[in-house]
Amino acid sequence: LMMGEIKTTKVDKENMKGEYKLKVENINFENIHSNVPTLNDISLKIKSGEILGIAGVSGNGQVELANIISGIERNYQGKVIVNGKNISNQGVRSRKNLNLSYIPENRLGVGLAPGVSIIDNSAVKDYFKSRLGPHLSSTKMLDYLNTLIKQFSIKAPDPRAEVSTLSGGNMQKLLMGRELVSNPEVIIAAQPTRGLDVSAVESLHELIINQRDNGAAIMLISEDLDELFKLSDRIIVLYEGEIVKEFDIDNANINNVGLAMAGSLE
């Protein structure tokens, strides 16, 4: 196994039945700038080897929910529980140490650091320090980046160029590769394939499925219903900060999900 290569191992889902990796309980959040409730009493659970799709038109609380689970947003009420541990008072780094990865919609800023080179953005320093020791050589970092470039078909002619020189699609590939390399147990992915070409979308869908088959609990936030229906086991619809409907994928109808997203489904 090469450094940085994602190892996937098929898991026996029946033996994991009922094992919830992520629980969100009674989350309430109010935007301090508008004093408008953004999330109202949100509760959900995701099992190992399960993909929960979050559907909703932009602006209905999906980003805020992802930021709360990942630890970026700390000013909320309710509980976030990973592997049975209440992590509500913990920050981003502590949550990453519990094997929770966040692939944000905002690639530059939240995901990748603007003004920083591609190679520095690619190196998950905490991850490598825990495995390779505190002294990271530029050679090790470059080897790792080359592994990501090959594995995720990233077009990065100059690894020392600023990350902003990459196309949006290649930024997303870099970000996803960096977050998935440690085989996280819980993955929060917000619009992970937006801006990618068809070939890249198929490649990243396969990666998401492999992570699910490897036992990860995955929350997939997307406005693309075709994507949600292809990948999800269940779909929850957020409308005006509330869960208005939950669908099991085997019994879901794409038109009804669309109506729920518009607030029109009784």
Identify what each model region corresponds to.
Residues 1-266:
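Glycine-rich phosphate-binding loops of nucleotide-dependent enzymes
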